[in-house]
Amino acid sequence: CKKILFLLKDQIHPEQYHKKKQETFFILFGKIKLILKEKRKKIIKILSEGDTFTIKPGVTHKFITKSNPGSVIEELSTYSSKSDSFYVDKSINLNKDRKTFISIN
């Protein structure tokens, strides 16, 4: 599955994990602060244009856009399933309109 994420400055991609899906992100434009939690260890990285990072299943992650006007991130994942996103803030899963999808046929 391929997704393109458009985030404005200081916008937060909320803290979540996936039980099955592995994600690889490519920073196409801008800069982000990536926060990972794996086995109770917190890791913070600053990533810029051209950087990549892979998140394995079970790793809690979030990122915040640190550049103005924002950032563009390409996501490649093993598959796409709304039911495999588990947000730390449980109210996010209740919002059925939390994402905008565009299909290109």
Model-based region annotation:
Residues 1-15, 21, 76:
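A short glycine-rich, His/Asp/Glu-containing loop-to-beta-strand
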Residues 8-12, 50-52, 56-58, 68:
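Tight coil/turn sites that cap or link beta-strands
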Residues 19-38:
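Glycine- and acidic-residue-biased ligand/ion/polar-headgroup-sensing regions
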Residues 31-33, 52, 60, 70-72:
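Structural motif
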Residues 38-61:
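Short acidic-glycine-tyrosine-enriched beta hairpin
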Residues 64-105:
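Double-stranded beta-helix
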